[in-house]
Protein backbone atom coordinates (compact mmCIF):
# COMPACT_ATOMS: atom_id res chain seq x y z
CA UNK A 1 0.00 0.00 0.00
CA UNK A 2 1.23 3.48 -0.88
CA UNK A 3 0.64 5.97 1.93
CA UNK A 4 -0.08 9.45 0.64
CA UNK A 5 2.08 12.15 2.24
CA UNK A 6 1.60 15.86 2.56
CA UNK A 7 3.15 17.66 -0.39
CA UNK A 8 6.17 19.81 0.45
CA UNK A 9 7.08 22.98 -1.47
CA UNK A 10 10.61 24.40 -1.49
CA UNK A 11 12.11 27.36 -3.32
CA UNK A 12 15.72 26.22 -2.79
CA UNK A 13 17.52 23.51 -0.80
CA UNK A 14 20.77 24.97 0.51
CA UNK A 15 21.36 23.63 4.02
CA UNK A 16 19.92 20.81 6.09
CA UNK A 17 19.27 22.96 9.15
CA UNK A 18 17.02 25.33 7.17
CA UNK A 19 14.46 22.54 6.74
CA UNK A 20 11.65 22.25 9.29
CA UNK A 21 10.91 18.91 10.92
CA UNK A 22 7.68 18.80 8.90
CA UNK A 23 9.61 19.27 5.67
CA UNK A 24 12.17 16.61 6.61
CA UNK A 25 9.54 14.02 7.45
CA UNK A 26 7.45 14.97 4.42
CA UNK A 27 10.43 14.42 2.12
CA UNK A 28 11.25 11.08 3.77
CA UNK A 29 7.68 9.87 3.35
CA UNK A 30 7.45 11.08 -0.24
CA UNK A 31 10.76 9.42 -1.11
CA UNK A 32 9.34 6.23 0.37
CA UNK A 33 6.32 6.56 -1.92
CA UNK A 34 8.57 6.91 -4.94
CA UNK A 35 10.44 3.82 -3.78
CA UNK A 36 7.12 1.94 -3.65
CA UNK A 37 6.34 2.94 -7.22
CA UNK A 38 4.55 6.28 -7.01
CA UNK A 39 4.71 8.36 -10.18
CA UNK A 40 4.93 12.06 -10.85
CA UNK A 41 5.25 13.75 -14.17
CA UNK A 42 5.02 17.49 -14.79
CA UNK A 43 1.70 18.67 -16.12
CA UNK A 44 0.96 21.53 -18.50
CA UNK A 45 4.57 22.59 -19.02
CA UNK A 46 8.06 21.31 -19.60
CA UNK A 47 10.61 21.58 -16.77
CA UNK A 48 14.35 21.86 -17.31
CA UNK A 49 17.09 20.84 -14.86
CA UNK A 50 20.86 21.12 -15.03
CA UNK A 51 23.62 19.61 -12.90
CA UNK A 52 26.56 21.98 -12.43
CA UNK A 53 29.33 19.96 -10.81
CA UNK A 54 32.65 21.72 -10.27
CA UNK A 55 34.00 18.95 -8.02
CA UNK A 56 34.19 15.27 -8.89
CA UNK A 57 31.11 13.20 -8.14
CA UNK A 58 29.64 9.84 -9.03
CA UNK A 59 26.74 9.12 -6.66
CA UNK A 60 25.29 12.61 -6.19
CA UNK A 61 25.65 13.61 -9.84
CA UNK A 62 24.35 10.42 -11.38
CA UNK A 63 21.56 9.80 -8.88
CA UNK A 64 20.26 13.32 -9.52
CA UNK A 65 20.39 12.60 -13.24
CA UNK A 66 18.42 9.38 -12.79
CA UNK A 67 15.94 11.15 -10.48
CA UNK A 68 15.42 13.94 -13.01
CA UNK A 69 14.79 11.49 -15.83
CA UNK A 70 12.43 9.37 -13.73
CA UNK A 71 10.38 12.53 -13.12
CA UNK A 72 10.27 13.33 -16.82
CA UNK A 73 12.43 16.45 -16.66
CA UNK A 74 14.54 17.65 -19.55
CA UNK A 75 18.17 17.48 -18.39
CA UNK A 76 20.54 20.09 -19.80
CA UNK A 77 24.03 18.60 -19.91
CA UNK A 78 26.95 20.56 -18.45
CA UNK A 79 30.64 19.73 -18.21
CA UNK A 80 32.82 22.37 -16.56
CA UNK A 81 35.83 21.20 -18.56
CA UNK A 82 34.02 21.93 -21.84
CA UNK A 83 32.19 25.11 -20.82
CA UNK A 84 33.00 28.82 -20.70
CA UNK A 85 34.32 28.23 -17.18
CA UNK A 86 37.55 27.41 -19.02
CA UNK A 87 37.46 30.95 -20.42
CA UNK A 88 37.13 32.47 -16.96
CA UNK A 89 33.34 32.54 -16.61
CA UNK A 90 32.26 32.78 -12.97
CA UNK A 91 29.79 30.48 -11.25
CA UNK A 92 27.37 33.40 -11.00
CA UNK A 93 27.46 34.01 -14.75
CA UNK A 94 27.10 30.31 -15.50
CA UNK A 95 23.95 30.13 -13.38
CA UNK A 96 22.72 33.44 -14.79
CA UNK A 97 23.00 31.94 -18.26
CA UNK A 98 21.15 28.77 -17.27
CA UNK A 99 18.37 30.83 -15.74
CA UNK A 100 18.14 33.07 -18.81
CA UNK A 101 17.71 30.13 -21.20
CA UNK A 102 14.88 28.70 -19.12
CA UNK A 103 16.37 26.22 -16.66
CA UNK A 104 14.03 25.75 -13.69
CA UNK A 105 16.37 24.08 -11.21
CA UNK A 106 20.16 23.88 -10.96
CA UNK A 107 21.88 21.24 -8.83
CA UNK A 108 25.29 22.65 -7.94
CA UNK A 109 28.42 21.24 -6.34
CA UNK A 110 31.24 23.71 -5.79
CA UNK A 111 34.40 23.87 -3.71
CA UNK A 112 33.52 27.26 -2.22
CA UNK A 113 31.53 27.19 1.00
CA UNK A 114 28.26 29.13 0.83
CA UNK A 115 28.69 29.64 -2.92
CA UNK A 116 24.91 29.94 -3.16
CA UNK A 117 24.63 33.20 -1.20
CA UNK A 118 25.17 35.49 -4.19
CA UNK A 119 22.94 33.33 -6.38
CA UNK A 120 19.86 33.50 -4.18
CA UNK A 121 20.38 37.23 -3.56
CA UNK A 122 20.30 37.94 -7.29
CA UNK A 123 17.20 39.70 -8.59
CA UNK A 124 17.86 38.32 -12.07
CA UNK A 125 18.50 34.62 -11.46
CA UNK A 126 15.13 32.89 -11.31
CA UNK A 127 16.05 29.20 -11.21
CA UNK A 128 15.93 27.26 -7.95
CA UNK A 129 19.20 26.05 -6.42
CA UNK A 130 19.79 22.63 -4.88
CA UNK A 131 23.09 22.41 -3.03
CA UNK A 132 24.89 19.24 -4.06
CA UNK A 133 27.77 20.08 -1.72
CA UNK A 134 29.67 23.28 -0.93
CA UNK A 135 33.29 22.70 0.05
CA UNK A 136 33.41 21.52 3.66
CA UNK A 137 30.09 23.24 4.34
CA UNK A 138 26.87 21.29 3.81
CA UNK A 139 25.47 18.32 1.89
CA UNK A 140 21.72 18.44 2.56
CA UNK A 141 20.64 15.85 -0.01
CA UNK A 142 23.08 13.26 1.36
CA UNK A 143 21.81 14.00 4.85
CA UNK A 144 18.20 13.46 3.77
CA UNK A 145 18.92 10.14 2.07
CA UNK A 146 20.82 9.08 5.20
CA UNK A 147 17.81 9.99 7.34
CA UNK A 148 15.55 8.06 4.98
CA UNK A 149 17.78 4.99 5.33
CA UNK A 150 17.78 5.25 9.14
CA UNK A 151 14.01 5.83 9.21
CA UNK A 152 13.40 2.72 7.10
CA UNK A 153 15.40 0.70 9.62
CA UNK A 154 14.14 2.08 12.92
CA UNK A 155 10.90 3.96 12.16
CA UNK A 156 12.08 7.12 13.91
CA UNK A 157 15.03 8.97 15.41
CA UNK A 158 14.18 9.70 19.04
CA UNK A 159 16.68 8.04 21.37
CA UNK A 160 18.77 6.41 18.64
CA UNK A 161 22.48 6.31 19.38
CA UNK A 162 24.43 7.41 16.30
CA UNK A 163 28.22 7.42 16.00
CA UNK A 164 29.74 9.76 13.39
CA UNK A 165 33.31 8.61 12.92
CA UNK A 166 36.28 9.97 11.00
CA UNK A 167 37.27 13.18 9.24
CA UNK A 168 34.55 15.27 10.85
CA UNK A 169 35.94 18.79 10.45
CA UNK A 170 36.25 18.44 6.68
CA UNK A 171 32.99 16.53 6.18
CA UNK A 172 29.94 18.39 4.86
CA UNK A 173 28.01 15.13 5.36
CA UNK A 174 28.83 15.13 9.08
CA UNK A 175 27.76 18.75 9.54
CA UNK A 176 24.39 18.27 7.87
CA UNK A 177 23.68 14.99 9.66
CA UNK A 178 24.65 16.15 13.14
CA UNK A 179 22.33 19.14 12.88
CA UNK A 180 19.22 17.23 11.85
CA UNK A 181 19.81 14.04 13.82
CA UNK A 182 20.33 16.03 17.01
CA UNK A 183 17.19 18.07 16.38
CA UNK A 184 15.14 14.95 15.70
CA UNK A 185 16.12 13.44 19.04
CA UNK A 186 19.05 11.16 18.27
CA UNK A 187 21.99 10.87 20.67
CA UNK A 188 25.17 11.74 18.76
CA UNK A 189 28.67 10.45 19.47
CA UNK A 190 31.70 11.71 17.56
CA UNK A 191 34.91 9.76 17.17
CA UNK A 192 38.06 9.71 15.08
CA UNK A 193 41.36 11.63 15.15
CA UNK A 194 40.95 14.45 17.66
CA UNK A 195 42.89 16.80 15.37
CA UNK A 196 40.09 16.29 12.82
CA UNK A 197 37.42 17.27 15.33
CA UNK A 198 36.27 20.80 16.15
CA UNK A 199 34.81 21.22 19.63
CA UNK A 200 32.20 23.61 18.25
CA UNK A 201 30.36 20.37 17.39
CA UNK A 202 29.95 19.63 21.11
CA UNK A 203 26.55 21.36 20.96
CA UNK A 204 25.30 18.39 18.91
CA UNK A 205 26.96 15.50 20.73
CA UNK A 206 30.03 14.29 22.59
CA UNK A 207 33.48 13.21 21.42
CA UNK A 208 34.49 9.75 22.70
CA UNK A 209 37.05 7.06 21.77
CA UNK A 210 35.62 4.63 19.22
CA UNK A 211 36.16 1.53 21.35
CA UNK A 212 33.98 3.01 24.10
CA UNK A 213 30.89 3.23 21.90
CA UNK A 214 31.05 0.35 19.41
CA UNK A 215 28.80 -1.87 21.55
CA UNK A 216 26.32 0.93 22.30
CA UNK A 217 25.34 2.45 18.98
CA UNK A 218 22.40 1.76 16.69
CA UNK A 219 24.02 3.50 13.71
CA UNK A 220 27.72 3.47 12.87
CA UNK A 221 28.20 6.29 10.34
CA UNK A 222 31.71 6.29 8.92
CA UNK A 223 33.17 9.19 6.95
CA UNK A 224 35.63 9.22 4.09
CA UNK A 225 39.11 10.52 4.86
CA UNK A 226 39.15 13.63 2.65
CA UNK A 227 42.72 13.54 1.39
CA UNK A 228 42.03 16.40 -1.04
CA UNK A 229 41.27 18.79 1.84
CA UNK A 230 44.37 17.95 3.90
CA UNK A 231 46.99 19.31 1.50
CA UNK A 232 48.96 16.09 1.91
CA UNK A 233 49.45 16.68 5.65
CA UNK A 234 47.74 13.57 7.02
CA UNK A 235 49.60 12.14 9.96
CA UNK A 236 48.31 8.57 9.51
CA UNK A 237 49.14 5.69 7.22
CA UNK A 238 46.14 3.83 5.78
CA UNK A 239 46.90 0.83 7.96
CA UNK A 240 47.44 2.97 11.05
CA UNK A 241 44.17 4.85 10.57
CA UNK A 242 42.22 1.64 10.04
CA UNK A 243 43.58 0.02 13.19
CA UNK A 244 43.01 3.04 15.41
CA UNK A 245 39.89 4.70 14.00
CA UNK A 246 38.37 2.37 11.39
CA UNK A 247 35.62 -0.21 11.70
CA UNK A 248 37.80 -3.31 11.65
CA UNK A 249 36.37 -6.80 11.40
CA UNK A 250 37.06 -7.23 15.12
CA UNK A 251 35.18 -4.06 16.06
CA UNK A 252 32.28 -5.10 13.82
CA UNK A 253 31.81 -8.29 15.88
CA UNK A 254 31.09 -6.06 18.88
CA UNK A 255 28.26 -4.15 17.21
CA UNK A 256 24.73 -4.85 18.41
CA UNK A 257 22.92 -7.31 16.12
CA UNK A 258 20.43 -4.65 15.03
CA UNK A 259 23.05 -1.95 14.43
CA UNK A 260 23.63 -0.72 10.89
CA UNK A 261 26.78 0.47 9.13
CA UNK A 262 26.61 3.58 6.94
CA UNK A 263 29.05 5.50 4.75
CA UNK A 264 28.35 8.31 2.24
CA UNK A 265 30.93 6.85 -0.20
CA UNK A 266 33.24 6.67 -1.98
CA UNK A 267 34.66 4.22 0.52
CA UNK A 268 38.37 3.87 1.13
CA UNK A 269 38.27 0.12 1.74
CA UNK A 270 40.39 -1.11 4.64
CA UNK A 271 40.74 2.48 5.81
CA UNK A 272 37.38 3.68 7.16
CA UNK A 273 36.03 0.14 7.31
CA UNK A 274 37.19 -3.35 6.47
CA UNK A 275 36.66 -4.39 2.87
CA UNK A 276 34.43 -7.32 3.87
CA UNK A 277 32.03 -5.01 5.74
CA UNK A 278 31.06 -2.83 2.77
CA UNK A 279 28.50 -5.38 1.54
CA UNK A 280 27.93 -7.20 4.82
CA UNK A 281 24.49 -7.97 6.28
CA UNK A 282 24.68 -4.98 8.62
CA UNK A 283 25.84 -2.57 5.94
CA UNK A 284 23.33 -0.13 4.45
CA UNK A 285 25.82 1.51 2.08
CA UNK A 286 24.16 0.13 -1.06
CA UNK A 287 20.74 1.05 0.34
CA UNK A 288 21.98 4.62 0.82
CA UNK A 289 22.96 4.81 -2.84
CA UNK A 290 19.61 3.40 -3.95
CA UNK A 291 17.64 5.67 -1.62
CA UNK A 292 19.54 8.64 -3.03
CA UNK A 293 17.52 8.44 -6.25
CA UNK A 294 14.16 8.37 -4.47
CA UNK A 295 15.06 11.14 -2.02
CA UNK A 296 16.31 13.35 -4.84
CA UNK A 297 13.08 12.70 -6.72
CA UNK A 298 11.19 13.94 -3.66
CA UNK A 299 13.40 17.03 -3.40
CA UNK A 300 13.03 17.89 -7.09
CA UNK A 301 9.27 17.42 -6.90
CA UNK A 302 9.12 19.75 -3.88
CA UNK A 303 11.13 22.38 -5.75
CA UNK A 304 8.94 22.16 -8.86
CA UNK A 305 5.78 22.04 -6.75
CA UNK A 306 6.89 25.41 -5.38
CA UNK A 307 7.02 26.74 -8.95
CA UNK A 308 3.60 25.47 -9.99
UniProtKB/Swiss-Prot annotation:
Enzyme Commission numbers on file: 2.1.3.2
Enzyme type, top EC level: transferase
One GO term (biological process): 'de novo' pyrimidine nucleobase biosynthetic process
GO molecular function: amino acid binding; aspartate carbamoyltransferase activity
UniProt xrefs under Gene3D superfamilies: Aspartate/ornithine carbamoyltransferase
UniProt keyword terms in alphabetical order: Pyrimidine biosynthesis, Transferase
Reactions catalysed according to its record: carbamoyl phosphate + L-aspartate = N-carbamoyl-L-aspartate + phosphate + H(+)
Pathway: Pyrimidine metabolism; UMP biosynthesis via de novo pathway; (S)-dihydroorotate from bicarbonate: step 2/3
Entry GO CC: cytosol
Binding, carbamoyl phosphate: 59-60, 109, 139, 142, 265-266
Assembly, per entry: Heterododecamer (2C3:3R2) of six catalytic PyrB chains organized as two trimers (C3), and six regulatory PyrI chains organized as three dimers (R2).
Protein name: Aspartate carbamoyltransferase catalytic subunit
Amino acid sequence: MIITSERISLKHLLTAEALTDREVMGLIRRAGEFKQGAKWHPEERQYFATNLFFENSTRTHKSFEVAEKKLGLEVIEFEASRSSVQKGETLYDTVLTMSAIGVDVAVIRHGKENYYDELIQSKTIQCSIINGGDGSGQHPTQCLLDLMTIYEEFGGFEGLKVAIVGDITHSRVAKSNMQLLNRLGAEIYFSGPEEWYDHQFDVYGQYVPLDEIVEKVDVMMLLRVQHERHDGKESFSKEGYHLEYGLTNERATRLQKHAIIMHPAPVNRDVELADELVESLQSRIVAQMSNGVFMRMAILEAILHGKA
